[in-house]
């Protein structure tokens, strides 16, 4: 036991450091908007639709700024967003010839999640860069009860977790014990209940955007 806790503490710190390499801050001008995750080495960033939207779901601007873990500020353009899925895809602009060192996150298997499994969410709550919070999976899938605005459900796929998400976590990664992406943190459904869009839904959305499918705002 005396060695177990120090080892666990070290492992969790290393895991947070690993995930933090793929975590970015997304902003529109001077206004901090939320978090995002580097999805591919060519500059795709995934976040929540509400992070890149103004009041009433209106698009803030097609131009955004993405701040990397090292503090580099890069221009990015909004490729597409889906308000129903609460997902958006940005593309880091490299027209100036820059080649930023991007660290895309590894995808996990969100369909294999089970209640009781350990997860970690990362983001920028209260302006704290790369803050981490951990918990366990409560449930996952599309068969969760519908509690309208008070909880998960509505026939959508969700990952529901026992941890306290804060506004700055929106758009940030939810990862498993290997640091693999299993969801994008989206909202709170209760005092200590967080909700995330599963990784397989994210991957499907990105594939449709890259294939040029229409129907996205």
Can you say where each PLM-predicted feature lies in the sequence?
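Residue-level recognition of beta-strand microenvironments
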Residues: 26, 41, 79-81, 136, ...
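C-terminal cap/linker of serine protease catalytic domains
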Residues: 1-16, 76, 121, 125, ...
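Catalytic-histidine neighborhood of serine endopeptidases
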Residues: 2, 40-85, 94-95, 200
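Catalytic nucleophile loop of clan PA
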Residues: 37-38, 118, 164-184
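Gly/Ser-enriched beta-turn/beta-hairpin loop segments
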Residues: 18, 81-85, 91-99, 128, ...
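A conserved glycine-rich beta-strand in the N-terminal activation segment of trypsin-fold
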Residues: 6-14, 23-44, 72-75, 132, ...
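Flexible, gly/ser-rich surface segments that form the specificity/activation loops bordering the active-site cleft
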Residues: 51-57, 80, 105-110, 115-154, ...
